[in-house]
Amino acid sequence: MHGEPARLYWRRRKVRLRPLVLILDISGSMADYSRSLLQFAHSAKRSAGRVEVFCFGTRLTRVTGAMECRRPDEALERAARAAFDWDGGTRIGDSLDAFVRGWARRGLCRGGIVVICSDGLDRGDPAVLAAAMERLSRLSHRLVWLNPHKRDDPAFRPSTLGMMIAAPHIDLLLSGHDLASLEKLAAVLPGLN
């Protein structure tokens, strides 16, 4: 009860980075962008701790393990071997539904930032895509969509059915067509925490 008063030190609150989930379209319509998106995913996985990477064409494939390779070319080669539907068709809704059912409900993206990289060209059932996007937007903290067709056009309006269905659930729509646009994404991600 007697003695010197204790000195209280306030510590700053630790900033915790949210988990980052990258879901990359590797279908034929995204062939011009798939390699650069996977290189971005490799860099993200190597520089940040809680990063999960998935690819899809007609089905979802988890490639997080492949992204842990030190050499980017080896990581891309392993990812290409894992995804049998590279440069094939696109079933965005089915792939996102598989992600929600198999991974998101287990807490993988709960409170995290989910980045979907796709042009929105989908051959699947629009109702499946709508339901998957709605569930994904509820489970994640932020839902970002990279569409390489957006380029740097501020007047861009979604024109594909997949993009029109996804648009109401997206928190941020960015381009993903070149290195500068991926650098912009990297700069924006910390602010989404």
Where are these regions (language model features)?
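Short glycine-/polar-rich loops that comprise or flank the Walker A/P-loop
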Residues: R18, S47-V51, G111-G112, L139-R142, ...
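Von Willebrand factor
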Residues: E74-G112, K150, P154-R157
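Short beta-strand-loop
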Residues: C55-A79
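Acidic, polar low-complexity linker/tail segments
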Residues: M1-L20, A31, R35, Q39, ...
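Structural beta-sheet core signal
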Residues: L22, V53-C55, V114-I116, W145-N147
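Von Willebrand factor type A / integrin I
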Residues: M133-N193
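Short acidic, Gly/Ser-rich segments with clustered Asp/Glu that frequently serve as metal-coordination loops
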Residues: V21, I26-R35, L60, L121-G124
